[in-house]
């Protein structure tokens, strides 16, 4: 091969020019190739977002994978993610069917369950046919020797009536200077209103426990009973009840914060403000609760840090929440616990967006092992110390392996995709996720808290928005006690029917006696 310096000057210059042009072209191709890869990545991310939105709109709501995505992960311990991928890519006709699951034997039906014993029994006796009431031989009446009995659950339509309240007035002719004595006004939710306490309570229970909005209730009242009521009159009565309940909820919040463990979450609520024509302001209900116990909703007009900072001021203990930044730096005495359900949700969405990718189902299967440990603890009734010991033995090694696997996955995948986001979120929350391995009272996730949000979200779909900013704290007070009573298995009508009329005259320093937990302990026969 002739060296370049051996060529004539003119030829050498031409070759050098061609080499320079070729280098420029190669550089251009490299830049274009990088640009195409970047655009492909953008398209892939946008495609993921579109698929995720479609899935959220039209897909199933439960976080379950299809059998095709999970069967091979559980077929046997030695099955690897690569084998899952290869199996998924094979033509459908060539795929090896997963091992059949054994059918569960059908449980023996115990028979019809009896209706609740506490319900009133109204007997309806059906007589025999007259021809069967007399003896065919002698004609004498045949005595009743028993009954063929069965029970049905009956009901009566709601009955409305007008209560005429007459307070006695007494005077004396022989001693006129005694004046006239009048019976005192009994305590009421709305002292001078035309709605009885039991009517207000019924509307409240239907709206906030059964999610039946006021306008539907009033429409049914007008159609079925011919009673027309102004909606504002009724909603004002509900807000009056909410205002009365606020001190009780403040006392319940004090009970909650005296503990060492609080779960926190937030959800949106539209608020009418009049500031923007045709648009509502987005307010927030912040939930503070304990698993299986007290629930306190705090209304705020925004999602900023000020809300949780004010509520949790002075609290010392563990706060379990998601990765929202507003929860950070709430105080030096607060330990933050993470939520594994939020981590799981990211990998679930990644699995739905890329059904052939074996990595998300693999991670979900590992997370499932952690939840299986929690189910064992729940089913066997372990206390906090016993549950912590079980977690150390069973869950600790799984968590260590899970973190190592997430780190390895993150190094293998490009940035920006849903799987990348899921890995980054999990690893960013890892120190908080491990808190449940250090305290047996802390749950593996925030699902108790999220569960309390669901009734509120369902009700919000029916009553649409709050009528004003001032209504927010009152509705929050009602929702707090409704959800707390549900968790405590406390009869809401009995509880509110007892405390609401008394609250107007109840001493402020004794409000703590009316919280659901205290009231339940004092009224065990009513529950």
Give the positions of each predicted feature.
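Gly/Pro-rich turn-and-neighbor structural signature
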Residues: 73, 116, 132-139, 210, ...
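Structured ligand/cofactor/substrate-binding pocket environments in proteins
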Residues: 197-201, 209-212, 297-330, 472-479
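Short helix/loop capping segments that flank catalytic or ligand/cofactor-binding pockets
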Residues: 143-146, 180-183, 271-273, 296-298, ...
């Amino acid at each position: 091969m002739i060296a370049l310096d051996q060529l004539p000057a003119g030829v050498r210059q031409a070759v050098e020019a061609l080499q320079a042009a070729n280098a420029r072209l190669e550089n251009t191709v490299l830049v274009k190739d990088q640009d195409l890869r970047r655009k492909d990545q953008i398209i892939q991310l946008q495609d993921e977002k579109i698929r995720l939105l479609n899935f959220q709109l039209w897909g199933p709501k439960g976080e379950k994978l299809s059998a095709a995505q999970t069967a091979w992960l559980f077929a046997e311990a030695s099955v690897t993610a690569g084998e899952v991928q290869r199996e998924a890519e094979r033509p459908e006709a060539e795929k090896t069917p997963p091992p059949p699951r054994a059918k569960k034997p059908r449980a023996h039906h115990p028979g019809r369950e009896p209706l609740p014993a506490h319900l009133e029994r109204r007997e309806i006796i059906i007589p025999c046919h007259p021809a069967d009431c007399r003896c065919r031989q002698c004609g004498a009446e045949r005595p009743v020797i028993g009954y063929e009995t069965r029970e049905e659950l009956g009901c009566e339509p709601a009955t409305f009536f007008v209560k005429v309240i007459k307070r006695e007035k007494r005077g004396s002719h022989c001693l006129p200077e005694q004046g006239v004595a009048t019976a005192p006004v009994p305590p009421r939710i709305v002292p001078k209103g035309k709605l009885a306490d039991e009517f207000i309570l019924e509307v409240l229970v239907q709206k906030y426990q059964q999610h039946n909005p006021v306008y539907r209730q009033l429409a049914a009242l007008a159609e079925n009973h011919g009673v027309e009521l102004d909606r504002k009159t009724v909603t004002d009565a509900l807000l009056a009840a909410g205002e009365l309940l606020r001190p009780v909820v403040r006392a319940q919040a004090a009970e909650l914060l005296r503990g060492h463990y609080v779960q926190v979450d937030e959800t949106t609520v539209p608020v009418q403000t009049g500031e923007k024509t045709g648009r509502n302001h987005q307010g927030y209900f912040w939930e503070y609760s304990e698993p299986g116990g007290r629930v306190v909703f705090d209304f705020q007009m925004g999602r900023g840090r000020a809300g949780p900072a004010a509520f949790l001021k002075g609290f010392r203990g563990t706060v379990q929440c998601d990765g929202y930044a507003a929860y950070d730096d709430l105080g030096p005495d607060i330990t933050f616990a993470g939520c594994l359900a939020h981590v799981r949700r990211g990998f679930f969405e990644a699995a739905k967006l890329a059904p052939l990718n074996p990595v998300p189902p693999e991670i979900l299967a590992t997370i499932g092992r952690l939840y299986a440990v929690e189910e064992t603890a729940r089913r066997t009734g372990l206390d906090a110390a016993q549950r912590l010991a079980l977690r150390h033995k069973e869950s600790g090694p799984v968590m260590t392996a899970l973190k190592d696997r997430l780190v390895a996955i993150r190094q293998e995948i490009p940035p920006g995709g849903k799987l990348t986001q899921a890995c980054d979120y999990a690893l960013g929350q890892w120190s908080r996720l491990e808190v449940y391995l250090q305290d047996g009272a802390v749950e593996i996730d925030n699902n108790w808290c999220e569960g309390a949000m669901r009734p509120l979200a369902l009700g919000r779909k029916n009553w649409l928005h709050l009528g004003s900013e001032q209504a927010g704290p009152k509705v929050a007070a009602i929702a707090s006690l409704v959800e707390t009573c549900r968790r405590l298995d406390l009869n809401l009508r009995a509880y509110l029917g007892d405390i609401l009329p008394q609250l107007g005259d109840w001493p402020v320093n004794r409000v703590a006696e009316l919280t659901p937990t205290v009231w339940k302990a004092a009224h065990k026969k009513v529950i």
